[in-house]
């Protein structure tokens, strides 16, 4: 009986996954959607591929004695505070670097594992074309690819496959 109850609870859970190229992207590109869906009862998880430590932290780099680790720590705290302010369920950091963002097969499989774990009702990521930031375009491509892999019965067949959640694309 307990198992059946647990299964029912899991199927009624509403969740969403935000795939963000840089730690600050989710805040101003889909922060309103995150806050709204949390309020509607969704568990919104954010996954940041990088901290934006090279290309999106100019003010920090202008400070004396700045190091890559200090920038990453600062950006992580900022993103965690933003996620908390939006009432996000969880935030994850893959620390893949940026400018350029590079997402290899191992990192893609980590994203697939996260997608399968969350089983999102919908996903959000960057728009398909951003002439000013190729990291964002790569994130879109990877979001589409990892969603596809998460749906494949032959990829780690012992795991629960993903249904077919809609992928919404955001930009300011």
Region annotations inferred by a language model:
Residues 3-19, 90, 101-172:
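Metal-dependent de-N-acetylase/amidase catalytic core
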């Amino acid at each position: 009986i307990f198992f059946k109850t647990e299964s029912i609870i899991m199927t009624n859970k509403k969740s969403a996954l935000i795939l963000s190229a840089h730690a600050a992207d989710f805040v101003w590109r889909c922060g309103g959607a995150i806050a709204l869906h949390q309020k509607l009862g969704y568990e919104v998880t954010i996954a940041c591929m990088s901290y934006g430590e090279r290309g999106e932290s100019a003010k920090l780099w202008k400070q004396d004695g700045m190091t890559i680790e200090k920038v990453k720590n600062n950006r992580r705290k900022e993103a965690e505070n933003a996620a908390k302010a939006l009432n996000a369920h969880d935030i994850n950091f893959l620390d893949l670097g940026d400018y350029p963002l590079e997402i290899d097969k191992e990192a893609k499989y980590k994203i697939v594992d996260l997608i399968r774990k969350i089983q999102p009702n919908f996903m959000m990521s960057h728009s398909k074309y951003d002439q000013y930031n190729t990291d964002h375009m790569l994130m879109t491509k990877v979001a589409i690819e990892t969603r596809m892999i998460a749906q494949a019965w032959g990829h780690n067949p012992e795991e629960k496959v993903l249904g077919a959640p809609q992928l919404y694309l955001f930009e300011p």
